[in-house]
């Protein structure tokens, strides 16, 4: 089956991406190796030159007609590949004449100049213009959201020019590599897609701005974790099998690499023993109490392992691994090229200290291995602090599991296998540790008695601290042990008399022990909460470190936004030079404008229609980026407009002005603000906010006037905007252009005008939307019907007006407010009757119709 054009473009784009990744890697290689192995590079360079000459002009022409994400990316990639290939070729030629590695790298990496900054000029009118500086992908995305907000007041020519500049800046920022450079994006700055994702999940009582703070964006630069964390030494050894026989010392380096990570730690090896013991029990076997405790402790130990990830690598192992890989590479290079490799990584290591090397990483180690090492070192530094030594629960958990295993293995003297009192005590201790409450009720009076006597033998210290006087009922006067003998005898007697009372209370509850148990439980709870917060903080920082160190690809968001905006501007400008579009301003004058206005100015819209009309106002005020109203499960237009305003950073009071404008009013005198032939003419505006409000009022007048026109004349005109495509089923089309802001599709023709009411008069001058002449029976032909057959509807200007043989709405005595008269087909003369009152005053009728 033959591929279509889109599939062929995808194949070309895939091959270009493959070559782009290879070319990007060549920039960091040793130039001596490149000169020795330059044949594949020259062959690929010739292919790129051919593709650039053959495909690039066609892709550019396609994007100036109708763009897509694929064609925009291919245009950007082909030009970048052509430039970088020529640059690398020139750098290699210069290096061959004068070997200087530093100069070579400065040339191919463009370190001597910075072209990653651009200033965009936006001009709305002669008096309103702005300059915006852009430097990162986040700046471009935010600027595109602002362009979407002002889409209706920006000329299509200016919009296309700005989009071309943004595409050029994207090419300079991204280059040929799909991997985004760290200096071209800000990971802590959110985008429009982050905003939309947060709007569809529960907010838990937090505002959207607070939820956006601290969020890592994964759309501008998409995080792609490396799939292979450990280097397969066996695969490397198999690839170097031929060289191993010719280079004697390679075998020793490979064996050292294999043995470096092969030794597994025996730390907490009894966890496997516990799991082996648990395999002997299932649903239909008798399960002892200690097995329940062992199962619970094993579960919590696994949960702890998920929270605190142990990494089986140290920084010393990573350094040794890096040195061994470097020795392996240099050994192969000396055998093939006669010298060690001195690429940009070797030159850069000399300028970095230890911590900087760790964050930069190693060319031989996967990024996630570095991330795991940093996380492990962070947790270890936290646990080594003496203040937090006891907060780490994992060692305590493993110790409990070990003790239970020892009790299971150790036979008791009664031969019960640990089911005696000692085993029960272990079970109780395990349940107490699992519950964490520490609340204990005394069930034996001996323990309470011994506790009470121990308190009394301490010289009455417990009573002196607040409880003694209440116990003896006033018999204790608070004296110390150095009082008189009589006083001592009285006190001993009182204590003996109150002994039964204190003992009875102690049987009920032991206050001292309860306080100690609750104190320990509280400290344990504080430790758990504090440790959990620290671990969550470390995990958050781990995600940030992963975003910084791991691979991040350039996301498609910016190109997608540019494509949508370009298509919108292209649709707005495609009918500018069309000769088939008829300008109604050449046919009608101010009289026709006044005719329609006077027929609408005294009417009013139904109040119940305002909410639906407000949604249409939001639709026409919005740009092409946020169009969730067309989704499978569509959102309302006010939600799309809210997305556009929030992502553009519109101030709250400006949003309130937009809402008040969209709410509308039922009286035409309050919304008819546009002058004759002045629709979408904002040349008098001196400020962007005023310009935006004027645009909203023009859109409101369009929507409400067309709705009132349909209500008054019984029509069904619909409105669309040139935002994505020209709707063939819509009648009135808003183009947002100053020269011809409105189009009317009617009876197979396309009309344009700068005045809304002239277009409505053009539509009104036909009997109905389909263009069929009414077929009501006529008694006998007259001059009017003959003229109507020739001219379509109206008489010639020099002919006198003759009354219609059919009764009009005024002659029938029917009020203009009665809607039933508007639904029946009208003759030509009934249009004139709408402009006359019952007294026959004809001042509102245009002169050409009298």
Curated annotation (Swiss-Prot):
GO cellular component: host cell nucleus
Start-end of Basic residues biased regions: 816-827
Superkingdom, natural source: Viruses
Residues where ATP binds: 709-716
Biological process according to GO: viral DNA genome packaging
Keyword Transcription found: no
Regions of compositional bias (Low complexity) in chain numbering: 439-457
Zinc fingers typed C3H1-type, residue spans: 191-219
Keyword tags: ATP-binding, Host nucleus, Late protein, Metal-binding, Nucleotide-binding, Viral genome packaging, Viral release from host cell, Zinc, Zinc-finger
Record field: compositional bias (Gly residues): 458-481
Motif Nuclear localization signal in this chain: 822-827
Annotated localization: Host nucleus
Keyword Cytoplasm included in the entry's annotation: no
Pfam short name (any one): PRTP
Disordered: region residues: 438-489, 801-831
Principal location: host cell
GO MF annotation list: ATP binding; zinc ion binding
Function summary: Component of the molecular motor that translocates viral genomic DNA in empty capsid during DNA packaging. Forms a tripartite terminase complex together with TRM2 and TRM3 in the host cytoplasm. Once the complex reaches the host nucleus, it interacts with the capsid portal vertex. This portal forms a ring in which genomic DNA is translocated into the capsid. TRM1 carries an endonuclease activity that plays an important role for the cleavage of concatemeric viral DNA into unit length genomes.
Assembly and oligomerization: Associates with TRM2 and TRM3 to form the tripartite terminase complex. Interacts with portal protein.
Family, similarity comment: Belongs to the herpesviridae TRM1 protein family.
Protein name: Tripartite terminase subunit 1
Lineage: Viruses, Duplodnaviria, Heunggongvirae, Peploviricota, Herviviricetes
């Amino acid at each position: 089956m033959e591929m279509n054009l889109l599939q062929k473009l995808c194949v070309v784009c895939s091959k270009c991406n493959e070559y782009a990744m290879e070319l990007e890697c060549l920039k960091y290689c040793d130039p001596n190796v490149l000169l020795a192995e330059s044949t594949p590079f020259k062959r690929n360079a010739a292919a790129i030159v051919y593709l650039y000459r053959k495909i690039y002009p066609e892709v550019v022409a396609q994007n100036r007609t109708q763009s897509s994400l694929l064609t925009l990316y291919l245009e950007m990639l082909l030009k970048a590949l052509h430039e970088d290939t020529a640059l690398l070729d020139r750098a290699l030629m210069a290096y061959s004449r004068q070997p200087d590695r530093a100069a070579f790298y400065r040339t191919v990496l463009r370190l001597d100049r910075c072209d990653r900054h651009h200033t965009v000029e936006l001009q709305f009118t002669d008096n309103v213009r702005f300059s915006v500086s852009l430097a990162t992908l986040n700046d471009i995305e935010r600027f595109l959201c602002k362009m979407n907000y002002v889409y209706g007041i920006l000329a299509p020519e200016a919009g296309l020019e700005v989009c071309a500049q943004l595409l050029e800046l994207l090419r300079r920022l991204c280059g040929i590599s799909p991997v985004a450079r760290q200096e071209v994006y800000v990971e802590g700055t959110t985008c429009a897609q982050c905003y939309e994702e947060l709007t569809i999940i529960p907010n838990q009582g937090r505002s959207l701005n607070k939820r956006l703070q601290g969020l890592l964006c994964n759309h501008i630069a998409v995080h792609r974790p490396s799939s292979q964390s450990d280097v397969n030494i066996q695969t490397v050894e198999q690839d170097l099998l031929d060289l191993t026989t010719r280079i004697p010392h390679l075998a020793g380096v490979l064996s050292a690499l294999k043995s470096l990570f092969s030794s597994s730690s025996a730390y907490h090896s009894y966890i496997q023993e516990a799991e082996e013991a648990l395999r002997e029990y299932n649903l239909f076997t008798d399960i002892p109490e200690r097995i329940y405790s062992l199962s619970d402790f094993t579960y919590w130990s696994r949960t702890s392992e998920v929270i605190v990830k142990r990494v089986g690598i140290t920084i010393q192992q990573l350094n040794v691994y890096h040195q061994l890989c470097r020795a392996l590479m240099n050994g192969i290079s000396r055998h093939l090229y006669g010298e060690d490799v001195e690429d940009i990584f070797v030159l850069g290591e000399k300028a970095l200290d230890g911590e900087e090397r760790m964050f930069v990483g190693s060319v031989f180690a996967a990024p996630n291995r570095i991330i795991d090492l940093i996380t492990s070192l962070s947790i270890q530094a936290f646990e080594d602090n003496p203040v937090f030594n006891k907060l780490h629960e994992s060692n305590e958990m493993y110790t409990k599991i070990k003790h239970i295993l020892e009790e299971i293995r150790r036979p008791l003297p009664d031969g019960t296998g640990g089911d005696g009192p000692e085993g029960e005590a272990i079970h109780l201790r395990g349940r107490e540790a699992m519950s964490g409450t520490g609340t204990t009720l005394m069930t034996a009076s001996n323990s309470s008695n011994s506790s009470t006597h121990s308190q009394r033998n301490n010289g009455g210290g417990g009573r002196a601290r607040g409880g003694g006087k209440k116990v003896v009922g006033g018999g204790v006067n608070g004296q110390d042990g150095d009082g008189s003998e009589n006083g001592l005898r009285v006190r001993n007697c009182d204590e003996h008399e109150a002994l039964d009372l204190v003992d009875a209370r102690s049987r009920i509850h032991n206050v001292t022990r309860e306080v100690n148990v609750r104190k320990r439980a509280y400290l344990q709870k504080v430790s758990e909460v504090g440790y959990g917060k620290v671990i969550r903080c470390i995990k958050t920082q781990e995600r940030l470190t992963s975003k910084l160190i791991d691979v991040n690809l350039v996301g498609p968001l910016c190109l997608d936004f540019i494509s949508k905006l370009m298509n919108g501007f292209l649709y707005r400008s495609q009918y500018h030079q069309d000769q088939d579009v008829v300008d109604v301003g050449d046919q009608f004058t101010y009289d026709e404008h006044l005719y329609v206005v006077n027929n609408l100015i005294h009417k009013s819209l139904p109040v119940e229609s305002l909410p639906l009309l407000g949604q249409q106002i939001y639709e026409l005020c919005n740009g092409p980026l946020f169009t969730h109203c067309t989704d499978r499960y569509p959102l309302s237009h006010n939600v799309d407009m809210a997305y556009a305003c929030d992502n553009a950073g519109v101030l709250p009071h400006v949003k309130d002005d937009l809402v008040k404008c969209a709410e509308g009013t039922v009286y035409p005198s309050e919304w008819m603000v546009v002058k004759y032939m002045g629709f979408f003419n904002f040349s008098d505006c001196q400020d962007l906010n005023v310009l935006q409000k004027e645009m909203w009022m023009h859109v409101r007048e369009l929507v409400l006037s067309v709705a009132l026109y349909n209500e008054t004349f019984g029509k069904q005109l619909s409105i669309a905007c040139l935002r994505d495509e020209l709707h063939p089923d819509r009648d009135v089309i808003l183009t947002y252009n100053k020269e011809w802001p409105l189009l009317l599709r009617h009876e197979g023709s396309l009309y344009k005008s700068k005045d809304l009411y002239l277009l409505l008069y053009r539509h009104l001058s036909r009997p109905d939307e389909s263009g069929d002449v009414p077929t009501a029976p006529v008694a006998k032909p007259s001059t009017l019907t003959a003229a109507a057959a020739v001219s379509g509807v109206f008489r010639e200007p020099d002919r006198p007006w003759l009354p219609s043989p059919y009764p009009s709405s005024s002659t029938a005595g029917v009020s203009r407010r009665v809607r039933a008269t508007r639904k029946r087909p009208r003759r030509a003369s009934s249009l004139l009757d709408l402009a006359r009152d019952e007294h026959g005053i004809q001042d509102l009728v245009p002169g050409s119709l009298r």
